[in-house]
């Protein structure tokens, strides 16, 4: 990040994570750091709306794509930090204190989404702390299988415009967007042009979708990286649009897609009365007066959600949290982003 950013705490170095306490494994040491982060904020844990679980055969292909520096990586080296079996990855999130997470899965061709959704039903049944996730693709019958996924208990959808190489405003998707808008079900959508642009990435296609479905609860993945300000514009125009923090503000992403510091006040605003007071039993001070509401609407402080991209990240999980912390937007903002906003959205 640029010089002058503020840290509320200190991120532990790799060596410190390895040797945090005598007898700790590296994983245990990292869990201590993550838990310390949210405990110091008085939170009951974290709500992470952007984590990836999918059939093992698919996930291994995703990892191989990153290893091979496929075109959509933008040619950036991307070592997978949490390359492990499913049970181990689930155990890591639980050790970190992530009380709710997702299984972001996505098709790259027709005929794949419904199969992924069937897998997700079983995964949700055996993983109660995972928010039941489903996906979609522009193809005949998409509205019908979206309805079936909702009937099966889906609580969040994933759309990946970059990987799927489709226009989100495709007429085939229009009925499905209508179903999801009517249901009030959030859709985490990778629609920004990072780390590599696609034919249909960027704010314009998403703007056309929202013009037709203004109540659609889109969660813009990666804060819209690198078109951050354009997607903030959309969030300010459409009250149900949210943004997740996935990979944004980290040292890794700042190298190729730095977040403009002039836009930081737009992320703030004043969070709504938080849930963590009730859940953690801790009193909360009044919001800091220096975080006054930006002039456009009341700010987006209650519509920014924690996302990380676990396990497919090239740095430790804790780094995403510390990257948010060092923005200097205050502890109330961190509580809202890392827990309360997601808990409210999903009724946790």
Tell me what each language-model feature is.
Residues 83-93, 115, 139-149:
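Short, acidic/polar
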Residues 155-159, 166-304:
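Catalytic pocket-lining loop regions of alpha/beta-barrel enzymes
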């Amino acid at each position: 990040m640029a010089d002058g950013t503020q840290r509320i705490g200190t991120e532990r170095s790799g060596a410190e994570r390895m040797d945090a306490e005598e007898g700790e494994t590296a994983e245990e040491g990292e869990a201590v750091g993550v838990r310390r982060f949210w405990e110091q904020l008085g939170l009951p844990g974290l709500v992470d709306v952007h984590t990836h679980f999918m059939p093992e055969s698919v996930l291994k292909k995703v990892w191989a794509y990153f290893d091979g520096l496929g075109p959509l990586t933008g040619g950036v080296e991307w070592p997978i930090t949490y390359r492990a079996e499913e049970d181990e990855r689930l155990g890591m999130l639980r050790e970190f204190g992530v009380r709710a997470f997702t299984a972001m899965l996505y098709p790259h061709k027709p005929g794949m989404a419904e199969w992924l959704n069937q897998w997700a039903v079983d995964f949700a049944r055996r993983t109660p702390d995972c928010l039941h996730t489903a996906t979609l693709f522009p193809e005949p019958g998409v509205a019908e299988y979206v309805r079936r996924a909702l009937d099966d208990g889906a609580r969040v959808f994933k759309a990946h415009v970059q990987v799927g190489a489709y226009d989100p405003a495709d007429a085939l998707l229009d009925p499905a967007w209508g179903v999801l808008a009517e249901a009030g079900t959030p859709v985490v959508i990778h629609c920004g042009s990072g780390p590599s642009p696609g034919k249909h990435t960027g704010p314009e296609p998403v703007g056309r979708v929202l013009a037709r479905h203004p109540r659609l609860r889109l969660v813009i993945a990666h804060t819209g990286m690198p078109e951050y300000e354009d997607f903030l514009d959309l969030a300010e125009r459409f009250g149900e649009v949210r943004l997740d923090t996935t990979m944004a503000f980290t040292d890794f992403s700042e190298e190729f897609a730095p977040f403009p510091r002039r836009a930081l006040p737009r992320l703030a605003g004043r969070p709504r009365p938080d849930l963590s007071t009730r859940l953690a039993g801790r009193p909360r001070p009044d919001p800091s007066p220096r975080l006054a509401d930006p002039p456009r609407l009341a700010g987006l402080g209650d519509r920014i959600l924690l996302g990380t991209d676990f396990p497919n990240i090239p740095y430790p999980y804790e780094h995403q949290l510390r990257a948010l912390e060092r923005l200097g937007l205050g502890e109330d903002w961190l509580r809202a982003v890392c827990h309360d906003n997601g808990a409210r959205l999903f009724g946790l």
